[in-house]
Amino acid sequence: ANMQHAGALRIDHVMALLRLWWVPKTAENAGGGAYVYYPIMDLLGILALESQRNQAVIIGEDLGTVPDGIRELLAQYNVYSYRVFFFETAEDGGYISPAHYPVQAMATLTTHDLPTLIGFWHCDDLRLGRELGLYKDDAQLHQLFAQRHANKQRILDSLHGHHVLPQDFERSVQHLGMDKTLNYAMQRHVASASSQLLCLQLEDALQMSQPVNIPGTSTEYPNWRRKLSQPLEQWTQDADIKQLFSDISVRRQN
């Protein structure tokens, strides 16, 4: 049903085709659960059939804990992988060049479950998480702030290394805020990915800071109710956004 009106379908947590962690009501916590396995070969066969019937591409959100061999199995059925820039790091902590992403994948900078680019860079998500009581103590929060600072520097180093920022652009994140130059450079950078598909968040083009969803919350935050900062008729006429999309189109064609 979901494929009938779209050319592509993204399956959230595609590992559910293989297994799900079930927690009985009687368990004291999530640790009292167990994996329940599903007939993945049958489900993949049905998925492939419906994909052909509806002429829809399938993207599998294969993040988190991924059992060995599953990505290869999904690839055999032409299910596209999902590569998020923030998660694509090497053993030394540096960011993998989007040019090295798998071809059979959809590349993206961030997702609906992550902060916007401005929110990430300014650590708005960490402060909001503190307000919502998402962290067990201040020590955990301090560690997250330190990790974020290091990640930002690695991102900036990578952007300079790929020459997507002006040569005279700041090279230290110590006092560097997120501006339009940096924002759009990150989007152009991931647009150069070797992956066949690209997904970008409209709120990043609009330079919005508030997230649309915060995992682990329900009534604490108005998930999925945040509106875009500009109506369709307005942002489609924005010269900077039009130039950004034009630059992205050129990079996707190369």
Where are these regions (language model features)?
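Catalytic cores of glycan-processing enzymes that make or break glycosidic bonds
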Residues: A1-N254
